[in-house]
Amino acid sequence: MRVADFSFELPEALIAHYPQPQRSGCRLLSLDGPTGTLTHGIFTDLLDKLAPGDLLVFNNTRVIPARLFGRKASGGKLEVLVERVLDDHRVLAHVKASKAPKPGAELLLGDDESIRATMLARHDTLFELCFDDERDVFTILNAVGHMPLPPYIDRPDEDADRELYQTVYSQRPGAVAAPTAGLHFDEPMLAALQEKGIEMAFVTLHVGAGTFQPVRVDTIEDHIMHSEYAEVPQEVVDAVLACKARGKRVVAVGTTSVRSLESAAKAAENGLIAPFFGDTRIFIYPGYHYQVVDALVTNFHLPESTLIMLVSAFAGYKNTMNAYQQAVAEQYRFFSYGDAMFISRNPRAPQEKVSP
């Protein structure tokens, strides 16, 4: 399967650099997987599309201010993007510098260079850093870190992004990118969903910077997926099984919830789904048979990304590419701060051939 088959033309002007003033005020493109029918509306229409007893599964990860600017003690400027917090003082991070720091190198971080860190070791593309500070990593990052806005949001982060680039239900710090489908849910909408009898459950997947890495191979099957830490606790498993038993739909909010739930399904030796705590490299592309997820709330994704492949596996390739073509024609806003889709699963998608 060719990566190029998942390309589409996107005018620069459709990339959203700021969210809508009201979270739930974005547009919603609904795609009926079985028929391919598209419906245009606004995000609060989701209330009418869900039935009492349906289960919404959210990702409650919290974005950390993971970007730090500074320099090596020896002089050269650098930029650090924390990928994973290992303990109170150590992190794995991407380091951008004219010359990569060597083990033992001292780094001066923060806009005022007040934070000292030491480079301990290199692990492939990541650097293990230790902060020489009595405060823990999260406290340091909250004090001097910048919100790690995606590369396509071409502006410096602002104070407002600390709230805007965060879901209202985020709880577990550790992500370096927001689970963006969740950004559209505000408190009034969550209350309205509960009032209607929509069930809710929360997984955790700490989104890594790898989510923005381009696919650098020509053939999808050759791509090596990045690893992310996910947790699907017993109460989520129970909620999913209860939802299926009452004949209702499991609706994943975002591709990270999809990847968490489907990882937990793969891990189940007996039955549909089992608790899952660990790293996942699940790569979902056309041909994949979904085990758990019946419907999906998601944003619009980058051309040739693993996420548009995941959506194509869910809705069908032709349905997905047609929906994206229509979204461009109708001037929907794309990517993290953009508009949303609501998609029901196409049961014929796994058998569909991918051909532009």
From Swiss-Prot:
GO BP annotations listed: queuosine biosynthetic process; tRNA wobble guanine modification
Gene3D superfamilies: QueA-like
Cellular compartment(s): Cytoplasm
EC number(s) stated in the UniProt entry for this protein: 2.4.99.17
InterPro entries assigned to the protein according to its UniProt record, in alphabetical order: QueA (IPR003699), QueA_dom1 (IPR042118), QueA_dom2 (IPR042119), QueA_sf (IPR036100)
Gene Ontology molecular-function annotations: S-adenosylmethionine:tRNA ribosyltransferase-isomerase activity
Catalytic class of the enzyme: transferase
Pfam families with a match to the protein in the record: Queuosine_synth
GO cellular component, one term: cytoplasm
Pathway as given in its UniProt record: tRNA modification; tRNA-queuosine biosynthesis
Annotated catalysed reactions: 7-aminomethyl-7-carbaguanosine(34) in tRNA + S-adenosyl-L-methionine = epoxyqueuosine(34) in tRNA + adenine + L-methionine + 2 H(+)
Keywords: Cytoplasm, Queuosine biosynthesis, S-adenosyl-L-methionine, Transferase
SUBUNIT field: Monomer.
HAMAP family reported for this sequence: QueA
Biological role stated in the UniProt entry: Transfers and isomerizes the ribose moiety from AdoMet to the 7-aminomethyl group of 7-deazaguanine (preQ1-tRNA) to give epoxyqueuosine (oQ-tRNA).
The family this protein is said to belong to: Belongs to the QueA family.
Name this polypeptide is given: S-adenosylmethionine:tRNA ribosyltransferase-isomerase
Gene: queA
